[in-house]
Swiss-Prot record:
It comes from Bacillus subtilis. One of its GO terms (molecular function) is DNA binding. It catalyses: a 2'-deoxycytidine in DNA + S-adenosyl-L-methionine = a 5-methyl-2'-deoxycytidine in DNA + S-adenosyl-L-homocysteine + H(+). Its EC number is 2.1.1.37. It comes from the Bacteria. The active site is at 170. Belongs to the class I-like SAM-binding methyltransferase superfamily. C5-methyltransferase family. It holds the Pfam family DNA_methylase. It is an enzyme of class 2 (transferase). Keywords: DNA-binding, Methyltransferase, Restriction system, S-adenosyl-L-methionine, Transferase. Residues 101-402 form the SAM-dependent MTase C5-type domain. GO terms for biological process: DNA restriction-modification system; methylation. This is Type II methyltransferase M.BsuFI. InterPro entries: C5-MTase, C5_DNA_meth_AS, C5_MeTfrase, C5_meth_CS, SAM-dependent_MTases_sf.
Length: 409
């Protein structure tokens, strides 16, 4: 029997209070971008994301006003990392209201890549850094002391992981150095990454290095690295990215390489483009007359303005452009021209600790328990955190899509 008085026949009646109605709200372009960039479960458009965020905010308010806990199935989860693939049973592994994506942090430095990748739905299970001063800064901020030289660590002693992160040393490929590539004494380090990938078979990896890696030895160095990564079965993608497109007032081009395990069936990946039309100028991050960073008149006269290989870049509070790349040897004024601030007791100074953090996208409360020399070296060797964070978000989103397709099979 169709229609009529049959129970449940006809169109479902939706209570007036539950009907969706068009409402107008005014928001900034910046807020719109933040909403659209937020990964929310089962939400694909702006309207759905707004509703989800509002519901979440209301639930959090209610939760804060009540002492009892809210049941798990009534909680809307907004998260960056949506899923992780269980190698043994092709299932989703859920812990602590979210997904725990395990990762290892190789050539960790002071933890810039970790800072960009880590969130409350990820867990670092292993880190390695050979430099004792960088390890000191790493431990001060993450509460764990990295293991030492990765070349001396057996891959069997490294925990299994979902993601391998590595900012392998860039000196052999840097435009500033001699561009020795595989002729450099650290040439074998990339092969340590390869042996760990081969043994542990993580779902994905993220590698970062200087742009010069692409052209070193007429491109042969990069081709060898790429061929070796692909020989392990991984789908490999790379892109030259610039920190100035990701909210930092610094021109800092780096090559980022990501790879996905063959079991995921991923054949495409789009790197985030950032916001090249809305760059942050250097004067936005300068602080007024910080003490202890002035360059003496003697050094200014002896080195800065008498070098044959160019003059330094001088900035002040009127400058609305992006500065040159911060390098590890920035503090060695007598060796390199660099960027200096027209400010301070002697009229010229180095970047302050706070400015270094802002240049690289580190939080202002990031601890720096080392000498001034080591501080400049460590930040100069680190990564543009917002850029890594954007790549990490794209990787997690692509992994989710692939895992959902696997689960449907």
């Amino acid at each position: 029997m169709r229609g009529g008085n049959r129970l449940g026949a006809g169109r479902k009646v939706i209570p007036e209070s539950e009907k969706k109605k068009r409402k107008s709200v005014y928001i900034t372009d910046k807020l719109y971008t933040r909403i659209m960039d937020t990964d929310i479960e089962n939400c694909n458009n702006f309207s759905q994301k707004c509703m989800a965020l509002i519901e979440l905010a209301m639930e959090n308010l209610n939760k804060n006003n009540q002492e009892h806990s809210v049941k798990r199935n009534n909680i809307l989860m907004v998260r960056d990392t949506k899923s992780t693939y269980n190698k043994t049973n092709n299932n989703f592994e859920k812990q602590n209201r979210g997904i725990k994506l395990t990762f290892i942090d190789l050539f960790a430095g002071i933890g810039g890549i970790r800072l960009g990748f880590e969130d409350k739905y990820t867990k670092c299970v292993f880190s390695s850094e050979w430099d004792k001063y960088a390890a000191q800064t790493y431990e001060a901020n993450y509460g764990e002391k990295p293991h030492g030289d990765i070349t001396k660590i057996n891959e069997n002693d490294i925990p299994d992981q979902d993601v391998l992160l590595a900012g392998f040393p860039c000196q052999p490929f840097s435009n500033i150095g001699k561009r020795e590539g595989f002729a450099h004494e650290r040439r074998n380090i990339i092969f340590d990454v390869l042996r760990i990938l081969k043994k542990k078979q993580p779902k994905m990896f993220l590698l970062e290095n200087v742009k010069g890696l692409l052209t070193n030895d007429n491109g042969n160095t990069f081709r060898v690295i790429l061929d070796n990564l692909k020989s392990l079965g991984y789908s490999v993608f790379y892109e030259v990215m610039d920190a100035q497109n990701f909210g930092l007032p610094q021109r800092r081009e780096r090559i980022v390489i990501v790879g996905f395990h063959p079991d995921l069936g991923i054949n495409d990946f789009s790197f985030p483009k950032g916001n090249p039309d809305n760059k942050v100028p250097i004067n936005a991050i300068l602080e007024h007359n910080p003490t202890g960073y002035s360059i003496s008149k003697r050094l200014q006269e002896s080195y800065l303005f008498k070098k044959d290989d160019g003059k330094p870049q001088i900035v002040d509070f009127r400058c609305t452009y992006q500065v040159n790349t911060l390098v590890a040897s920035y503090h060695k004024i007598q060796r390199l021209t660099g960027t200096f601030v027209k400010d301070g007791e002697t009229g010229l100074r180095l970047f302050s600790e706070l400015e270094l953090k802002r240049l690289m996208g580190f939080p202002v409360d990031f601890k720096v328990p080392v000498s001034r020399t080591q501080m400049y070296r460590q930040f100069g060797n680190s990564v543009a955190v917002p850029m890594i964070k954007a790549v990490a978000g794209a990787m997690k989103e692509r992994l989710l899509l692939a895992e959902m397709q696997v689960l449907k099979k």
